[in-house]
């Protein structure tokens, strides 16, 4: 049976882990790093797709084809305010497609967020496979606790496109609690997980109990903001740098994508440095140029200035904390321990603010960048049977219901209900002789239907003619362990039933997902062929170099005819390298190897002769010249 891996699909960075001999193992990627930038790039002059650090390295010179923070678009519609805000902040193109979803366009091709996220998941899959030495087909993938149904479904689609059977979607704060609590917590504790990542913020209140040797993790409540994270902090620094540069130099950098990409990298670096230093310098030579010549950016930023720039963002995290406590029917003093998760929590001001709110110093026992992946691996271990005595009870973050007469949302399942769960309610017709009812499924907390998230709708038809209010239609909601919803409607009189797994009114169809899976498989073939081509080119380069070197060393021992034949074979191989025909390169490698065989034999003969000479010399050195003394016989 193949191993189930745990993947933290982050906005800024991603991470993969497995259970290994009863312990969690974070797996290093091919670059030797424990986390991978969630960045995908499409180079201008190549069909290759770059993922992770290689994509990040070329971002400055290729900003419009370098995609980052794609998680913020997953499961979202183009017209949402959050998406409209991002359009003006990122260098790549966000577009609206026919179903209303927000996609991106790169090099003339439109792509869905799950399709792009699948590239990052694919990198995590390959990282695990390289470590394990076997194919991986199953995974547990984490999502922000406050992700709605559309975003959860889109994340599952991304896993599927990457070639994985997603065994479970698990909330990030819950995963972090697992990582923290499985080994470190004894007895019963109520903990708060404050998770401020690259693009999202979550807070969860979780009760941990030891019951007859089994650890129970029960989520009491969760809240958050799916468009608040480190990326927003970076943007505040970028905005400050742009304003200061414009004031000082009179040049607006917002219209220069390459300059903005350099500013983004500098902002992220400055933010990290200010977590351990009181001040940092942002130096960007030749950031732009005008008629007067090149312009250099040199601006000092203090920690106090950064705190001022992001003060409102920090305050935005407190309200969800208050709501989560209220929903759990607890006060801050009831919390035993606070865990910080997400790279942005390394900011000292965040730690202080959380400490002030909960009245206790946050624990630093877990790595904020790795805790979520570790928890995903533990959950994978539970599902695979490797981890015993752990029970996880998660919740649905938002209320679920249907639209009823007058545009009102009637809730069937309240937020923070433990999942899996189901609920049913009887509804009726609104007018006489109504032959069909439309079930419009909603998610959210508002009473007005229009103010909530529309998850989809379907019709139950064939209802017999009857006065309004007489037919009985039973609507049933069923949420699985991933927080994904099935809805059915049944006419109690006729027994007719209609049911669907909720897909957002947008979202990817099954056909689109299958097409993307096939595209991903095709790209996997392309990637393999590309790697094989590069290997052949490298072999050719190495052979050319060594042959030229040998020719030079043996120039006095090689005839002009031999030299001419070998040099011609070298020239032909050099020409072949300039094209991307692997077969032609391999053929020319064989030709040069064959033509250069006499050279190889000469080198071997020369080496053998030298060794023989050395051995003879050593043997001569080993002969001892003895001193003889003549002894005269006196007899």
Swiss-Prot record:
Q: Does the keyword Chaperone apply?
A: yes
What is this protein called in UniProt? Chaperone protein DnaK
Q: Provide the alphabetized UniProt keywords.
A: ATP-binding, Chaperone, Nucleotide-binding, Phosphoprotein, Stress response
Q: Region Disordered: start and end of each range? A: 595-635
- What family does this belong to? Belongs to the heat shock protein 70 family.
Q: Name one Pfam family in it.
A: HSP70
Per UniProt, the ranges with Basic and acidic residues bias are 612-621
Residue ranges with Acidic residues bias: 622-635
Q: What induces it?
A: By stress conditions e.g. heat shock.
| Gene3D superfamilies the UniProt entry points to | 1.20.1270.10, 3.30.420.40, Actin, Chain A, domain 4, Substrate Binding Domain Of DNAk, Chain A, domain 1
Q: Which one of the record's GO molecular function terms can you name?
A: unfolded protein binding
């Amino acid at each position: 049976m193949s191993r189930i891996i745990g993947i933290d699909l982050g906005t800024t960075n991603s991470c993969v882990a497995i259970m290994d001999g009863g312990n969690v193992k974070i797996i290093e990627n091919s670059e030797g790093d424990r986390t991978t930038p969630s960045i995908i790039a499409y180079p201008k002059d190549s069909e290759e797709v770059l993922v992770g650090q290689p994509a990040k390295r070329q971002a400055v010179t290729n900003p419009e084809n370098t995609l980052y923070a794609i998680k913020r678009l997953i499961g979202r519609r183009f017209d949402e305010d959050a998406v409209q805000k991002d359009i003006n902040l990122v260098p790549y193109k966000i577009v609206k497609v026919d179903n209303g979803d927000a996609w991106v366009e790169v090099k003339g091709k439109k792509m869905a967020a799950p399709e792009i996220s699948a590239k990052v998941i694919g990198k995590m899959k390959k990282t695990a496979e390289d470590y394990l030495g076997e194919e991986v087909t199953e995974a547990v993938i984490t999502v922000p606790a406050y992700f709605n149904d559309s975003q959860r479904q889109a994340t599952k689609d991304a896993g599927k496109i990457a070639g994985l059977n997603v065994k479970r979607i698990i909330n990030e704060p819950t995963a972090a609690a697992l990582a923290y609590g499985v080994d470190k917590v004894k007895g019963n504790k109520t903990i708060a997980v404050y998770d401020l990542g690259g693009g999202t913020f979550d807070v969860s209140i979780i009760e941990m109990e030891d019951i007859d040797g089994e650890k129970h993790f029960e989520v009491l409540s969760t809240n958050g903001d799916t468009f608040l994270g480190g990326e927003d902090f970076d943007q505040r620094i970028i905005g400050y740098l742009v304003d200061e540069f414009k004031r000082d130099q009179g040049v607006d950098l917002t219209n220069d994508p390459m300059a903005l990409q350099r500013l983004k990298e500098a902002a992220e670096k400055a933010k990290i440095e200010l977590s351990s230093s009181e001040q940092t310098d942002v130096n960007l030579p030749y950031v732009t140029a005008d008629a007067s010549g090149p312009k250099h950016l040199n601006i000092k930023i203090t920690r106090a200035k950064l705190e001022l720039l992001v003060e409102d963002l920090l305050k935005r995290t407190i309200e969800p904390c208050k709501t989560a406590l209220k929903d759990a029917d607890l006060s801050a003093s009831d919390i035993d321990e606070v865990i910080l998760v997400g790279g942005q929590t390394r900011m000292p001001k965040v730690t202080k603010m959380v400490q002030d709110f909960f009245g206790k110093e946050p624990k630093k026992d877990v790595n904020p960048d790795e805790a979520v992946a570790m928890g995903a691996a533990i959950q994978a271990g539970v599902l695979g049977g490797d981890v015993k005595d752990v029970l996880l009870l998660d919740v649905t973050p938002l209320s679920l219901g249907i639209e009823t007469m007058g545009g009102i949302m009637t809730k069937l399942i309240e937020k923070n209900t433990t999942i899996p769960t189901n609920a049913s309610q009887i509804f009726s017709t609104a007018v006489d002789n109504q032959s069909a009812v439309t079930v419009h499924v909603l998610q959210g907390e508002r009473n007005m239907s229009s103010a909530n998230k529309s998850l989809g709708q379907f019709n139950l038809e064939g209802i017999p003619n009857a006065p309004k209010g007489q037919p009985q239609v039973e609507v049933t909601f069923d949420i699985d362990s991933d927080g994904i919803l099935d809805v059915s409607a049944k006419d109690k009189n006729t027994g007719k039933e209609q049911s669907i797994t909720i897909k957002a009114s947008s979202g990817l169809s099954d056909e689109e997902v299958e097409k993307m899976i096939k595209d991903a498989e095709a790209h996997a073939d392309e990637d393999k062929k590309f790697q094989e081509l590069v290997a052949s080119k490298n072999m050719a380069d190495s052979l050319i170099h060594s042959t030229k070197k040998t020719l030079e060393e043996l120039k006095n021992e090689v005839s002009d005819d031999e030299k001419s034949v070998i040099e011609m074979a070298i020239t032909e191989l050099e020409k072949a390298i300039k094209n991307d025909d692997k077969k032609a390169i391999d053929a020319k490698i064989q030709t040069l190897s064959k033509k250069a065989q006499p050279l190889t034999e000469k080198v071997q003969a020369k080496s053998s002769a030298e060794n023989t000479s050395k051995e003879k010399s050593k043997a001569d050195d080993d002969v001892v010249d003895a001193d003889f003394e003549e002894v005269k016989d006196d007899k």
